[in-house]
């Protein structure tokens, strides 16, 4: 198996750009560097774990994913000061980076893939890099502790395979933010061309099912909104904020779900 990938593809895979076209534009503009060397050809094959930087990049995190967690932190009472966290589906580490910048003291960065976590996070002693690790096999004993906070951003797997494990890793006083991705939750017949779900009724069905499933896992809804950025294929995604406390939890109603979906489609 090759350990190299086209530069434009790698930049998208790392969440630095939402499309190959935008990645290519940045490459042609001379904005992409591997270590201190500028790379100006989109087709250049580079190591999948290369240290890539974007000159003039205004993104505050190692990937766009950090903006998703940032929104949740801004609108919900999430205090990560000195928190121990699990980042499920860490990938490049956007959520991990955001959490660290907001005070987290330790992050278990878990992903079934490998050679994806950003170089700066690999070097950060606060980050425990758990690559090649299927979350469904992770136990509290493996971590050595229960955690204060969990973030979930997974692909090609439903949250109904992840939430039951996540709740076993979380303290009773902890909280969890999950990215709900309709393209991986809806049946294949409801996913459109290019893997995009545009039907708001499908969005509502997915949210209803996942929120009820979380409730059955004793993860109670305390906030629901839409992601501030779309997925790489242009999919609308949603953010659920949960705790293990049923006190002041939101009721999972059609009105709540419809309002959030309508707002997401209005953008």
Features from the language model and the residues they span:
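A short glycine-rich, Lys/Arg-flanked "PGG" loop and its adjoining helix->strand segment in the class I
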Residues: 160-177
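Flexible, glycine-/basic-rich loop-and-beta segments that form/coincide
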Residues: 236, 240-267
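Conserved S-adenosyl-L-methionine
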Residues: 98-106
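Conserved class I S-adenosyl-L-methionine
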Residues: 81-91
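S-adenosyl-L-methionine
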Residues: 108-161
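Short, glycine-/aromatic-enriched active-site segment of Class I SAM-dependent methyltransferases
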Residues: 182-199
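A basic, amphipathic helix-loop patch mediating RNA/tRNA/ribosome contacts
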Residues: 1-50, 84-85
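Glycine-rich SAM-binding Motif I of class I
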Residues: 93-94, 115
């Amino acid at each position: 198996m090759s350990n190299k990938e086209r530069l434009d593809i790698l930049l998208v895979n790392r969440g630095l750009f939402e499309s190959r076209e935008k990645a290519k534009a940045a490459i042609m503009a001379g904005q992409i560097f591997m270590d201190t060397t500028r790379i100006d050809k989109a087709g250049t094959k580079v190591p999948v774990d290369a240290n890539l930087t974007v000159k003039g990049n205004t993104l505050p995190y190692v990937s766009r994913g950090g903006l998703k967690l940032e929104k949740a932190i801004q609108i919900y009472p999430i205090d990560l000061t000195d928190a121990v966290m699990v980042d499920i589906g860490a990938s490049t580490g956007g959520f991990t980076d955001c959490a660290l910048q907001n005070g987290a003291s330790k992050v278990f960065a878990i992903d079934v893939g490998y050679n994806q976590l950003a170089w700066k996070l690999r070097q950060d002693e606060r980050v425990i890099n758990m690559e090649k690790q299927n979350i469904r096999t992770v136990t509290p004993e493996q971590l050595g502790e229960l955690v204060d906070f969990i973030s979930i951003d997974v692909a090609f797997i439903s949250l109904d395979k992840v939430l039951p494990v996540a709740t076993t890793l979380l303290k009773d006083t902890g909280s969890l933010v999950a990215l709900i991705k309709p393209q991986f939750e809806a049946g294949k017949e409801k996913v459109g061309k290019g893997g995009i779900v545009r039907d708001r009724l499908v969005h509502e069905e997915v949210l209803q099912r996942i929120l009820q499933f979380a409730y059955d896992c004793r993860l109670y809804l305390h906030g629901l909104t839409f992601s501030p950025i779309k997925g790489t294929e242009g999919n609308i995604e949603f953010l659920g904020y949960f705790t293990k406390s049923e006190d002041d939890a939101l009721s999972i109603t059609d009105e709540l779900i419809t309002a959030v979906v309508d707002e997401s489609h209005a953008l």
